[in-house]
Amino acid sequence: MLVLYGHSTQDVPETNARVVGGTEARRNSWPSQISLQYLSGGKWYHTCGGTLIRQNWVMTAAHCVDRTMTFRVVIGEHNLSQNDGTEQSASVQKIVVHPYWNSNDVSAGYDIALLRLAQKVTLNSYVQLGVLPQEGAILANNSPCYITGWGLTKTNGQLAQVLQQAYLPTVDYAICSSSSYWGSIVKKSMVCAGGDGIRSGCQGDSGGPLHCSVNGKYTVHGVTSFVSSLGCNVSRKPTVFTRVSAYITWINNVIASN
């Protein structure tokens, strides 16, 4: 059984991840990170992260846009509660969810969506495109990565106001799919990272990037998907990400045809 936006006593995946055990990111040090926000009662609220991949396209998790809402993207953001002077916002004009996504079964994979913005954002030192990996690229076990987001800073806690980052080394598929970790819930189309019981993603980080250092350059290898419903930072339950390198062709095709 899988839980979306809820809690269960069983150890099942729960979407909505956020950063636990992290530190405040240096201002605008992750310039492809976006805040996905929804409109409610005349105010905008952060719900998920995402990555700017073209000037008018954002990559996020499918489960972030399951519900019909008015969304906008804010980029160049650092502190959600104040105007940093570097932000740009754009309304979401079109949402393209992966055709195989099933909101009742996040463990099947395909937790990825692309958002076309109503206008192009301007690139500058605060706003940059995320670099995506090559199709099929698989990271070695214990590769150095960082998760970033404004998600909860502890299980059942509060959203972070300033962007957080946490070091989450990858856990390869052989280990992550073993019975003492996630078992068969994790698929080859996913990336696992963390699992030390201290640092993790948590609610509100979902859809955001896993930045991995490859040849000295940060590449977005993951889209934050789910954590254990027992808590965000559970030992041997790494944060699970959609593996971006499994979807490069799909991403390029969607952008080309829209």
Curated annotation (Swiss-Prot):
Name of this protein: Chymotrypsin-like elastase family member 1
EC code: 3.4.21.36
Cofactor: binding comment: Binds 1 Ca(2+) ion per subunit.
A cellular component annotation (GO) from this entry: extracellular space
Record-listed Ca(2+) binding positions: E77, N79, Q82, E87
Residues in Peptidase S1 domain copies: 19-256
Single GO molecular function: serine-type endopeptidase activity
One GO BP: proteolysis
First and last residue of the signal peptide: 1-8
SUPFAM superfamilies recorded: Trypsin-like serine proteases
Name of the gene encoding the protein in the UniProt record: CELA1
Catalytic activity of the protein: Hydrolysis of proteins, including elastin. Preferential cleavage: Ala-|-Xaa
Keyword line: Calcium, Disulfide bond, Glycoprotein, Hydrolase, Metal-binding, Protease, Secreted, Serine protease, Signal, Zymogen
Family, as annotated: Belongs to the peptidase S1 family. Elastase subfamily.
Glycosylation sites noted in the Swiss-Prot or TrEMBL record: N79, N233
Propeptide feature ranges: 9-18
Subcellular location: Secreted
Catalytic residues of the enzyme: H63 (charge relay system), D111 (charge relay system), S206 (charge relay system)
General function of this protein: Serine proteases that hydrolyze many proteins in addition to elastin.
Cofactor list: Ca(2+)
Alphabetized InterPro entries for the sequence: Peptidase_S1_Elastase_sf, Peptidase_S1_PA, Peptidase_S1_PA_chymotrypsin, Peptidase_S1A, Trypsin_dom, TRYPSIN_HIS, TRYPSIN_SER
Gene3D superfamilies xrefs: Trypsin-like serine proteases
Domain of life: Eukaryota
Disulphides: C48-C64, C145-C212, C176-C192, C202-C232
Pfam families: Trypsin (PF00089)
